[in-house]
UniProtKB/Swiss-Prot annotation:
UniProt keyword annotation of Protease present: no
Taxonomic lineage of the native organism: Archaea, Thermoproteota, Thermoprotei, Thermoproteales, Thermoproteaceae
GO BP of this protein: translation
GO cellular component, one term: cytosolic large ribosomal subunit
Protein name: Large ribosomal subunit protein eL39
Amino acid sequence: MARNKPLGKKLRLAAAFKXNRNPPVWVVVKTKRRVTRSPARRHWRRVKLKA
């Protein structure tokens, strides 16, 4: 990927980066481990973004 990115692409990549994480610990505790993983997790090599 180019070092110099357009601002729109940079913002979309940043939003995807933020969304790609586990749920917070307090959610796991509050649901008594019923919710332990996020269905929207994405691996950088397996699933590519349309950004």
